[in-house]
Amino acid sequence: MLLGTPLFSNGTKILLLGSGELGKEVIIEAQRLGIECVAVDSYDNAPAMQVAHRSYVIDMKDGDALKAILEKEVPDYIIPEIEAINTDILIEMEEFGHQVVPTANAAKITMDREGIRRLASEQLNIPTAKYEFAESLEELKKAVKKIGAPCIVKPIMSSSGKGQSTVKSEKDEDIEYAWNYAQAGARGIGKKVIVEEFINFDYEITLLTARTAHGTVYCPPIGHIQDGGDYIESWQPHPMSEEMIKKAQEMANKITTVLGGNGIFGVELFIRGDEVIFSEVSPRPHDTGMVTMITQNMSEFEIHLRSILGLPVDIQLITAGASSVIKSKIHKYAPQYDISDAVKVPNTKLRIFGKPLAKVGRRMGVALASANTVEEARKNAKKCANGVIIR
């Protein structure tokens, strides 16, 4: 592997589409290898922009604007970090020889819940929750009746649990609330929602799956808790039998093989008894995987970059650990962070994302903790996160 010098004609260049906290860590890893970094997002001073060589603010669903930047920069690797992107342009650029991570087709299929759910259930026959799609309130009422209450309603495109709610009855007012909530939290164009069967699972995991030039490798399973579809804490390793880990890996391998390309995939799975049930997959680092910054010899971000570049990936768990999200309780531009109490918690680290605008409930940072046991790590991570005061 030959790497050039950033800002010179021989430099190796990556361009991130989406510049949030996950993209920020990818760029930090790239900077360590002397890679030129360009960050793109819909708002200025996004986290990854703060550590990139250059940045652009555009609507990434605007095909002309997106194409103009890609043609201007001519990056070696185009790395989508969010779903709300004009993937038709990515397919076009890939046809002209640009490398899209993992592939333009994978980005298109996984950009919304409909594409990936139909691939998993209807093409690959992978077990999933029962589901229906709806494009109007009337269609949603019929779908809820067919699936049965309780059920989950989500926009087909959203992030961090936005727009997701549980319909607890078949009453019109409950369904109407879910419809309006989904529309308010949706990304992209269109009104379509997915209605999913409510699964009483034993636990849910993220299986970080890396497709590399040397084969597919897996991180130890990551357990996590979500609140309204938004991750609030994760831990690694989650205890599982070897048999169940093998089942999970086989399912992850099946779906990531079809998606193709190299890079890390966040495969979300429900575990119920001896069943593994597919939930979702993202062809990029996963928010629950931030715990790997303290638990593994390579974080998910380093794994992603090394996989993209064709470098060896040797994953080792070095400690039990946990992450706990730091959410804002206020709405403020350019907030400040009092970390005086947080830094007193032993064996913890803070990652403040640097988002320019704090909103109530917005994820502004994460606390990481290592310990001899997952239980101790979870306790310390939460204590550290709760010790951060946003002002």
UniProtKB/Swiss-Prot annotation:
Its EC number is 6.3.1.21. PROSITE patterns: ATP_GRASP. It comes from the Archaea. Keywords: ATP-binding, Ligase, Magnesium, Metal-binding, Nucleotide-binding, Purine biosynthesis. GO terms for cellular component: cytosol. It catalyses: N(1)-(5-phospho-beta-D-ribosyl)glycinamide + formate + ATP = N(2)-formyl-N(1)-(5-phospho-beta-D-ribosyl)glycinamide + ADP + phosphate + H(+). InterPro entries: ATP-grasp (IPR011761), ATP-grasp_carboxylate-amine (IPR003135), ATP_grasp_subdomain_1 (IPR013815), PreATP-grasp_dom_sf (IPR016185), PurT (IPR005862), PurT/PurK_preATP-grasp (IPR054350), PurT_C (IPR048740), Rudment_hybrid_motif (IPR011054). The keyword Metal-binding applies. Mg(2+) binds at residues 268, 280. Pfam families: ATP-grasp, PurT_C, RS_preATP-grasp-like. Gene3D superfamilies: 3.40.50.20, ATP-grasp fold, A domain, ATP-grasp fold, B domain. Belongs to the PurK/PurT family. Homodimer. This is Formate-dependent phosphoribosylglycinamide formyltransferase. It comes from Methanococcus aeolicus (strain ATCC BAA-1280 / DSM 17508 / OCM 812 / Nankai-3). The gene is purT.
